[in-house]
């Protein structure tokens, strides 16, 4: 009897010691991989940030270069045809996380160069989508080099996404959660939480140490939460949900029209560039070139935005991105949300500054279907003083924006409206 008891005790001790040893080794493995990924992707994203800052500064100092937008478009199409095969963009990264698809290593230098060309010549495009592709491509290649299995490669790609997002924006909390949340709406990849958070923090710290300034804005005139202010913010949030839907439809519609009328990619990008130039000349402003950071700052910090600024940013982004230029739609969605929210705030008699901040988070939520990320972005960029309004804006926008989204490979696993498994792709 005593012998059997001792034997069982030894078996239990062996089992638990082996289990603890396995868990510790797995923890150490992902700590090391996350730090390595954060450093490598952080370095690449820092260089990317400095490059975009340099080309944007050059464009502002030499406004004539905007007329070279058709030429840069031709170069971009040529590079992708000769080197990049078919570009899946951010969708390809999301597909890699969920399936056996790969992000080609060539995606990293291609998206770097072509996004810089787009910003140099004044296309209306963002940078975060490009950074996610950059980080995903580098991390995927790192996973191949060290012979990670399929499941671990999915996690390291998510680490790369988080690291790139964090390095550019300086928002490590939002960046870590974004990678977990964006692939499948309603399901969080918690197995990747620790490595994504570590990679995000390392990349953010690396970028900050190299001189990349984290994005932050000062929100003014934050009102007390009352029934009146809460209802007004609810109306702003509903408007933002509608705007996010219209933005997704505009992007998809522009892609459809370009594809229908201009089968040749070279002709398509030239026509798109000429349309962007024409609209810009008609508007007589260069504020809509690039990501729109100046419009965001003006809306949030000064409470000022032209009435139709959100509309024109939407139009020019759709014309630019769907013609074949590179960059991303995330920062333009920030700009659209901030300017729309600011206008709504002025119309409704509530602080345009807080409405711009809430609009930015709400439209981002509407186009990405990532409510937790959206709330964290608001916290990290605007501070915690307006927390009640951020929660109202993001939650209402998430529910009211339906199943639309920027990414066709994003899956809505569970319904937004009831505890129901739906497993469907987003509408574009």
Labelled PLM ranges:
Residues 1-428:
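Alpha-helical transmembrane segments and immediately membrane-proximal extracytoplasmic
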